[in-house]
Amino acid sequence: LSGLFRGYQAIADECAKDGVSYTDYLKRLLDYELECRAHNGRQTVLKMAGFPTLKTLEMFDFKESAVNKAQITELATLRFIANAENVILLGSSGTGKTHLAISLGYLATQQRYRIRFFTAADLLLQLEVASSQNRLEQYLSKIIAGSRLLIIDEFGYVKLNETQANLFFQLVNKRYETGAIIITSNLIFTKWQEVLNNDEALTAAILDRLIHHSHII
């Protein structure tokens, strides 16, 4: 009840000034405590998200972008998270993909969804470390599957070797139809095979799982 200890005196003074009943005073105290808990919860999941910087949809200039605003507005309802659907943001550098990904992630934290943000390079490094320490399944279950939304930024800038490509498949497969993914890439889908160790079958399997139940922007 930390909120009560911090705010009870100010609320008591306010209630005395307003001449409210003792019952109303208790109600204001409880409302304040609940709001403090909600705020603390939002701050906790925001910190855990790991955003490199904070971006919001209000900061995005739709007039200077080819992005469909109506489509983003629909995504901002966060129904895609509840439905374990994916969002794939494609485009060249500087088109606002990362901004939109972080903005949607920020909205999710305000609803107290557990989310994680990674660049593709950082995520693959962590997957490799976990695999080398024989704790890949634990990592996938706790960090990856344990988040309602996983954001993978900058996929396609670095080519993956065979081990990395297989680890990426395991990650995508782990979340398939169970958790939402937002992924940004500078490459159209026909170029993904070049990044995924030129493995045609693996690329097809990854794209099949990502594109199924997805919103492509």
Name these PLM-found stretches.
Residues 2-53:
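Interdomain "pre-motor" coupling segment immediately N-terminal to P-loop NTPase/helicase cores
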Residues 6-9, 24-28, 58, 73, ...:
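Solvent-exposed alpha-helical segments within well-ordered globular domains of core cellular machineries
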Residues 7-14, 87-90, 156, 191-193:
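Short hinge/gating elements
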Residues 38-82, 86-90:
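Extended interfacial segments that mediate partner engagement and assembly in macromolecular machines
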Residues 67-145, 195:
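Conserved P-loop
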Residues 149:
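Walker B motif beta-strand of ABC-family P-loop ATPases
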